[in-house]
């Protein structure tokens, strides 16, 4: 007789693709820590939803479309209130986690004056090598013979910006790894 205990995680990500990619390291950490014995309910905007296509542990996907007067939160509450979660990770700093049946709440509150990557790493104790590996492996499987990379050294908000030297370092690293073309 084998008993498999699942963690039920409610993961509320972003509407933007870039933000969702940043948040993905946290989801990967939960998967790694729970040895894939995890069931995830994902809430995300429609644009970044394909990022999660290969995540088989996502049992429910909810596209959150913003509405006037924040009515999207009431709609989301109606959709999720029948369920119980072991933990919520909320990158939108919403109040919904306080109204749902959740054992543990991780509400990410961005400090506008600090770097977002450092804030996420400190709050969730992510491991850059291990927690980005799932995404990297998936991209390699989708594009096995690709030999190019795209860098986008711009953001829509100052705390997400990296110093120019970081992009130069990434480009050098990619070239050292055999990338022939880098598009900016």
Question: Locations of the language-model features?
Answer:
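Catalytic machinery of carbohydrate-active enzymes
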Residues: 1-184
């Amino acid at each position: 007789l084998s008993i498999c205990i699942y963690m039920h995680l409610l993961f509320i990500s972003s509407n933007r693709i870039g933000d969702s990619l940043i948040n993905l390291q946290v989801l990967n950490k939960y998967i790694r820590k729970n040895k894939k014995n995890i069931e995830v309910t994902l809430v995300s905007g429609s644009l970044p939803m394909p990022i999660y296509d290969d995540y088989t542990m996502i049992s429910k996907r909810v596209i959150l479309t913003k509405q006037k007067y924040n009515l999207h939160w009431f709609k989301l509450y109606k959709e999720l209130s029948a369920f119980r979660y072991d933990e919520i990770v909320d990158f939108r700093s919403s109040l919904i986690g306080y109204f749902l049946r959740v054992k543990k709440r991780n509400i990410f509150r961005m400090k506008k004056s600090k770097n977002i990557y450092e804030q996420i790493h400190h709050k969730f104790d992510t491991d850059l090598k291990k927690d980005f590996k799932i995404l990297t492996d998936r991209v390699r499987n989708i594009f096995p013979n690709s030999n190019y990379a795209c860098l986008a050294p711009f953001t829509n908000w100052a705390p997400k910006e990296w110093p120019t030297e970081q992009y130069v370092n990434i480009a050098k690293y990619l070239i050292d790894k055999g990338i022939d073309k880098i598009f900016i």
